[in-house]
Amino acid sequence: MTPELTRFGEEMSHLTGVRAIMKDIIETLQAGQGQLLINLSAGNPVILPEIEQLWRDCTQALLASAEYGQVVCRYGTSQGYEPLIAAIKDDFNQRYGLALSDRNILITPGSQALYFLAANAFGGYHATGRMKDIVLPLSPDYTGYGGISLVPEAVRAYRPTIIQDEASHRFRYRPDFSQLAIDENTGFVLFSRPCNPTGNVLSNADVEHIANLAAAHNVPVLVDSAYAPPYPALNFTAMEPVFGENILHCMSLSKAGLPGERLGVAIGDPAIIQVLECFQTNFCIHSSRYGQAIAARAIASGALAQLSEQVIRPYYQDKFAVLAAALDQALPQDLPWYLHNGEGAIFAWLWFDQLPITDQELYQRLKQRGVIVVPGHPFFPGLRDNWPHTRQCLRLSLTASRAELAEAATRLGALVTEVYRAPPSQSGATPSMAVPAR
């Protein structure tokens, strides 16, 4: 049966971003069973023994409690499981000196669902018929943002400033405030901090500047804090959440070891929370109460924050250091390659300036050498101009073993050297690929 789809149905029934590439990656992994394939594409967190044990302990406590039946055998409120809301409120008030009430917090079925709710509550066509943009102020950013709106043309990203250190082969992105437009045509602003895929951590000053620009037009700012402190605390540089009247602090417990339970948290102004809660009631009623109940125990006890700092962060920070050292050794110093500063998250982001082939071609040729990465172009959702930089980057996951990361860097270095050294006719270069990235 092939029912006719609406315009929205057509939009939402297609895979976007990395999810479209994952089909090819899965087929490659299945076809390559028995081969030595190094998979640096994964977004799933590593199952760390201490973290798994925490969730086992919290589950055992829930099973033994008198409230078990009330948690899993009954519906709850759309706002979320009350003990979890209380645990988050108390922790944030104590940790950051806030004065949150229960009405400042909403629990959602994952942070992706939260951004979908916000995108379609604040972005797109308003009652007057005017389009309100969903502004991504720092591109590249999370590929999933490309699929959150029922009105895809509402998503608008801005090219960043690139800060290079040629001697160390490092770089980082920063918002280009001379180009960034947040005005009466903006519905809301969204960015990740730390950033997936780059690991970039926007400074407090930059976050506050974005929030101030938005506040002048009564525009909410959603900060995707899926990798931020206090849990999972996947920041490798000092940072704290930034709060403000128009800032919605958005968390996920996926990288804290609960991706299967789909738990997102929004913290912000009650007026914004109320809109999203009503949307969620119509959308899915509420998030899984089982996941909320075990999360409430982990947060209230302090165990989740402690293990995030003592186990989760050091694990991935060490992996980044291993990969960075291996890349420094494997990639020639005279080639224009740059590794984004390791500021957080579970990925490394590589830029090959003036790359003679596209990132998609590099991805395909790396597969032939037994290394699976993610090409960078899906991480520029909403970017309107034709920027060669979008076809010059790769995302590498830090979930592989130390030995696999080192071997992958060696294979990548050999291939990239061949690509840059080859005559244009052999490298597959095209004029559009042979121009500087800026």
Where are these regions (language model features)?
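Conserved PLP-binding active-site segment of the aspartate aminotransferase-like
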Residues: 41, 268, 349-356, 373-415
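Short, solvent-exposed loop/turn segments at secondary-structure junctions
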Residues: 43-47, 112-113, 141-144, 194-197, ...
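N-terminal small-domain helix-loop-helix segment of the aminotransferase-like
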Residues: 2-5, 11-110, 166-178, 299, ...
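Conserved core segment of the aminotransferase class I/II
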Residues: 131, 150, 243-317, 329, ...
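Conserved core of the PLP fold type I
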Residues: 70-217, 222-243, 248, 420-438
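Conserved glycine-rich beta-strand-loop-beta hairpin in the small C-terminal domain of fold type I
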Residues: 39, 310-324, 336-352
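Conserved PLP-binding catalytic core of the aspartate aminotransferase-like
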Residues: 335-370, 436-438
